[in-house]
């Protein structure tokens, strides 16, 4: 049995750091665990220009303690009106690492998102030409589609045609939650990859709904049936370079979660590596953890691997019920790994 696990410094390829007071509260947790993070642009207003991206990067850097070596990677928020030249300029200037496709109204802060992918094909063609990755929240928003089916329907209606139309575009199918998504990514060409969150390794939809409404287990995409959780977990722990770490850590204050219309999002940053390690350990796949956490992501993005290492050790720690005004993932639970 492995009691200590040392891996190359990992990265988080999908995180919400928010802004203002919440940014100051949560950014240090991500920066302690990860060397780099792809930071989501769904602020109010969203990050759509290079100037806005540069300013947000500066605010993140100011929120991270000076003794932590952390690089925020900024993402452009795509809208129906996005200008391809602006996206290309931000990428060329080193401001934008990638661009994010939110289907309009799919999740928190997506009201300005894209109503039809056809509206941004010119932008996507330019991104293909310059090697800029597209990050996708892969759910349809049609009212006639059941919320548990939105990811699978998105693959059929939007993602499959997009991959065919733009075979050179790097695409990250973010926070996958279904067997269909895991299979699609596994079978897709090398330019298609996926991120996987810790919560979708550990919980199914019962966590939200059994014994009462559990708002702190509510995120988008929602957790699905158990067979989907098992398929996503098998993909994560498989060693395939197509799957890598993206926490989708998404903090909301308690009163925004525990409400008649509560917000979607799970704050997992404080114990993210421990949570992932627990899943890999349970599945006898610790040998594949470094690839998932530290290697597959940068290789897909074409970025250098991090120098240095982090060490996790087998130790029981109890996750606090609250961290400030936010309830963390695994609140009140004992987990079996600790970041040294």
From Swiss-Prot:
It is an enzyme of class 3 (hydrolase). It holds the Pfam family Amidohydro_1. Substrate binds at residues 16-18, 42, 137, 220, 252, 264. InterPro entries: Amidohydro-rel (IPR006680), DHOdimr (IPR004721), Dihydroorotase_CS (IPR002195), Metal_Hydrolase (IPR032466). Its EC number is 3.5.2.3. The keyword Lipoprotein does not apply. Transmembrane segments: none annotated. Zn(2+) 1 binds at residues 14, 16, 100, 248. This is Dihydroorotase. Binds 2 Zn(2+) ions per subunit. The active site is at residue 248. CDD domains: DHOase. One of its GO terms (biological process) is 'de novo' pyrimidine nucleobase biosynthetic process. GO terms for cellular component: cytosol. GO terms for molecular function: dihydroorotase activity; zinc ion binding. Catalyzes the reversible cyclization of carbamoyl aspartate to dihydroorotate. HAMAP family: PyrC_classII (MF_00219). Belongs to the metallo-dependent hydrolases superfamily. DHOase family. Class II DHOase subfamily. It comes from Sphingopyxis alaskensis (strain DSM 13593 / LMG 18877 / RB2256) (Sphingomonas alaskensis). Homodimer.
